[in-house]
Amino acid sequence: MSKHDNVIGYIEYLDSSGCVQERIPYVDAEEFKTRIYASLYCGEPIIPVVFPENLSQPLTFEKGTIFPWGLRSEKHELLPYEIYQTNDRKISFLRYNYTKGHINAASYKLVYRGQMECWQTLDSLYCLHNQENRPNGRKMRSLSVSDIIVTHEGGEAHAYYMEPIGYKQVDDLLPGLEQAKKRSVEMGER
């Protein structure tokens, strides 16, 4: 049983353009409903997302409650992600601006495959993979500048180059990283 098996849903907080800025999970139905009502009352743009299979009884709202940005019911699913690292001295531990002319996906190796919750962010993956007891810690170094995280959601993949602060989207490297993944699988690496 995963530590997130008891999550009953999450709230998507939207920015002014309607894009999801943050997702916060909830395990307690009353706390979840209270936060939803508080956000709706203040006019905060949110989309509550409910996992019905994780509820002991249906989540009900007061008659006439309007969700201007929507209310969704979903199956609780984990999203796959991968981490790629390189030992190429021309790009290892360097910012993207210094390396963009030298980056070659073929120099990267798939070092980890895992699953993340839909509310997890690149920053939360960074924290997870920089702990002393990080996943696959014996076979990969902690995450650092020049590493690439590939996320998968809704049939789309996106690649992110780790910068000293933040991430640079590098989807143009996806075809080469897919080849690196195939090489790793053929060699029996995980």
Language model region names:
Residues I8-E12, P80-Y84, I148-V150, H158-Y161:
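Ordered hydrophobic segments in well-structured contexts
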Residues I24, I36-A38, F67-D88, P135-K139, ...:
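Charged, low-complexity intrinsically disordered segments
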